[in-house]
From Swiss-Prot:
HAMAP family found in the cross-reference section: 16SrRNA_methyltr_H
Name by which UniProt lists this protein: Ribosomal RNA small subunit methyltransferase H
MF-aspect GO terms: rRNA (cytosine-N4-)-methyltransferase activity
Lineage of the species this protein comes from: Bacteria, Bacillati, Actinomycetota, Actinomycetes, Bifidobacteriales
Annotated S-adenosyl-L-methionine binding sites: 39-41, 58, 87, 108, 115
Annotated Pfam families: Methyltransf_5
Family classification: Belongs to the methyltransferase superfamily. RsmH family.
Gene: rsmH
Compartments where found: Cytoplasm
A Gene Ontology biological process term: rRNA base methylation
Coiled coil: none
GO cellular component assignments: cytoplasm
Species annotation: Bifidobacterium adolescentis (strain ATCC 15703 / DSM 20083 / NCTC 11814 / E194a)
Keywords: Cytoplasm, Methyltransferase, rRNA processing, S-adenosyl-L-methionine, Transferase
Function text: Specifically methylates the N4 position of cytidine in position 1402 (C1402) of 16S rRNA.
NCBIfam families attached to this UniProt entry: 16S rRNA (cytosine(1402)-N(4))-methyltransferase RsmH
């Protein structure tokens, strides 16, 4: 059995506990960890909140097994329910558990140490491995399939949208050319291809393939679509006083989280409206001033924390019916920026 306590360092653990635990003080409180991983954060939440129980969601069956074992070792298994699911099944998971409202929801959107360190997953550009990149190995789409089957236009789209890659067209063109004679099946092959395409003078810090690997991982796992679809579900299941705490690791995730939270932090009325109706008042309270970042000491101890952005809000009143309807319908909340409206 893998020793999860040594391979996994939870990012900003103290900050996360300080944000989550106050919402779990009452007997019967329920927390949901949407990205359970190896349960580093979740074990800390339960230890700090003896009156609470926790539902842990993960699409990675190996991580679920290790997390469950860890809970047993920590004596927390009686307050822990593991669920194999993607977090965009949030509402269904709660329904299956007979739960409607929850008091705290946590999301750590980074890769777990298990996924990074087990080279056969193909997540890391530092090791030569099959191009898999599935967080849930029961799902069909792999990174190898994306590279083999996507059109030039679709490859450009994902590298540009999900990797913010400046040389998307050049990389996609070389992939399409090369795959006609040599299938791209390993991370080493992809590394070498990107290394040949991206000019030395225009390389970001670190491995030049970093953005391409990020884009492929997001595409294979549908990460941004799942995040955008999950946040409204979470809001509709938060109890008043409940908290949503999210750690993101790249700008696309952070922008999505920020845009969603901002909906409930602002007055939803035109700036020239003389009297604002109650249902247009904010329903979230910001718990972090902007985003919390890792300090130099944490980065030195855990380099994976360097890019983290931690945001949190508390639900201060029931969500207005029209916002609940938008959330239920899966509205494109990112487009609902209320320009010219009250802050």
């Amino acid at each position: 059995m893998t020793d999860v306590t040594t391979i996994h360092q939870p990012v900003l653990l103290r900050d996360c506990v300080d944000l989550v635990a106050p919402a779990l003080a009452k007997p019967g409180s329920i927390a949901v960890d949407c990205t359970l991983g190896l349960a580093g954060h979740s074990t800390a939440f339960l230890k700090a909140s003896p009156n609470a129980r926790l539902i842990g969601i993960d699409r990675d069956t190996e991580a679920l097994a290790l997390a469950t074992k860890r809970m047993e070792m920590e004596g927390l298994a009686d307050r822990f329910t593991p669920v194999h699911a993607a977090f965009d099944d949030f509402s269904q998971v709660l329904s299956d558990q007979g739960v409607d409202k929850v008091n705290a929801v946590f999301m750590d959107l980074g890769l777990s140490s298990l996924q990074i360190d087990e080279t056969e997953r193909g997540f890391s550009y530092s090791h030569d491995a099959p191009l898999d990149m599935r967080m849930d190995v029961t799902q069909p789409l792999t990174a190898e399939q994306v590279l083999a089957e996507y059109s030039f236009a679709d490859l450009v789209r994902i590298f540009r949208a999900y990797g913010e890659e400046r040389f998307s067209k050049q990389i996609a063109r070389e992939i399409v050319r090369r795959r006609e004679t040599e299938p791209l099946t390993t991370s080493g092959q992809l590394n070498r291809l990107v290394d040949e395409v991206v000019p030395q003078a225009h390389r970001p810090a670190g491995n030049p393939a970093k953005r391409v690997f990020q884009a492929l991982r997001i595409e294979v796992n549908g990460e941004l679509d799942k995040l955008a679809g999950t946040l409204p579900q979470i809001a509709n299941h938060l109890a008043v006083g409940g908290r949503l705490v999210v750690e993101s690791y790249h700008s696309l995730e952070d922008k999505t989280v920020k845009a969603f939270m901002n909906q409930g932090l602002k007055v939803d009325a035109p700036a020239d409206m003389p009297v604002v109706p109650p249902d247009m008042m904010p329903f979230f309270k910001e718990l972090t001033r902007g985003a919390i970042k890792a300090d130099a000491e944490e980065i030195a101890n855990n380099p994976r924390s360097a890019s983290v952005r931690l945001r949190a809000v508390e639900l201060t009143r029931p969500i207005p019916a029209r916002w609940r309807k938008r959330f239920d319908q899966g509205a494109d909340y990112a487009s609902m920026t209320r320009q010219g409206r009250r802050d």
